[in-house]
Amino acid sequence: MDIISLKAYAKINLALDVIGKRPNGYHDVRMIMQTIKLYDKITIKPTTNPDITIKTNLHFLPTNENNIVYTACKLFKDTFQISDGFYINLEKRIPVAAGMAGGSSDAAATLFGLNELFQTNQSLEDLMKLGVKLGADVPYCLLRGTALSEGIGEVLTPLPPAPNCYCLIVKPPVSVSTKFVYENLKLDENTKHPNIDGMVEAIEKQDLHQMSSLVSNVLESVTIKHHPEIERIKMDLLSHGALNALMSGSGPTVFALFDNQKAAERAFYEYKVGPYGKQTFLTRFFESKNV
């Protein structure tokens, strides 16, 4: 095998809670993570030249060490003492800086692909331990599916597949700094924390309506204050028949869950021809863990 193509799937947070802050600045979280069928495509080809070369369809993306795919390649080369270089084509579809772990998923797929290409025989657990060096979301992006995420995001408990539904993704054209959101999050006795345990129970019972009623994200209190259009999108999606709508991660992406295909498609078509059309997607949950 001298070339490999992989799909790097996006994630949403069905629930996101922040428990507290560590002395080192990291935050302890409890999250329900869900992979969706929106993906980037990554093609990797080893080269005799030792350099790492990345080509992408987005002109503004860095193709050097500031790209997490490059960093993943460098980590893999150094860990397994590989002299070959890599040519990588990265076709982005997941919105960038959107709270959907697009970069982390690209890094995860890269590690998985290199493990296959060079037959380094690393288990999923081995790759996850390697991946956490790149970012807290990378281990989950290797695991995929439905999972409870704790610690700083690296402690993962796989859950049964969440009840499937139609998932409409809308990303408004604003930029959100994850660092800014966490730094400005105020946790006190008035903080409304998600019912994570209740959502786990709803998922285990395959109760879509109960699960949808419990979607919640403490980071909304920061991001929506600075970008009120997120709240407007949520309310509008509810008026289109969504069971619920929520900001994913630190934002600004909003997802809406539908149990009715026609309602989901109607909302999708309306948004597709509107100002958010380029960053609007209708998808479903992803269950399989195969790349």
From Swiss-Prot:
Pfam families on file: GHMP_kinases_C, GHMP_kinases_N
Cysteine-cysteine disulfides: none
GO molecular function: 4-(cytidine 5'-diphospho)-2-C-methyl-D-erythritol kinase activity; ATP binding
Keywords of this entry: ATP-binding, Isoprene biosynthesis, Kinase, Nucleotide-binding, Transferase
EC number: 2.7.1.148
Residues of the signal peptide: none
PANTHER family: 4-DIPHOSPHOCYTIDYL-2-C-METHYL-D-ERYTHRITOL KINASE, CHLOROPLASTIC (PTHR43527:SF2)
HAMAP family in the cross-refs: IspE
Name listed for the protein in its UniProt record: 4-diphosphocytidyl-2-C-methyl-D-erythritol kinase
Organism for this UniProt entry: Lachnoclostridium phytofermentans (strain ATCC 700394 / DSM 18823 / ISDg) (Clostridium phytofermentans)
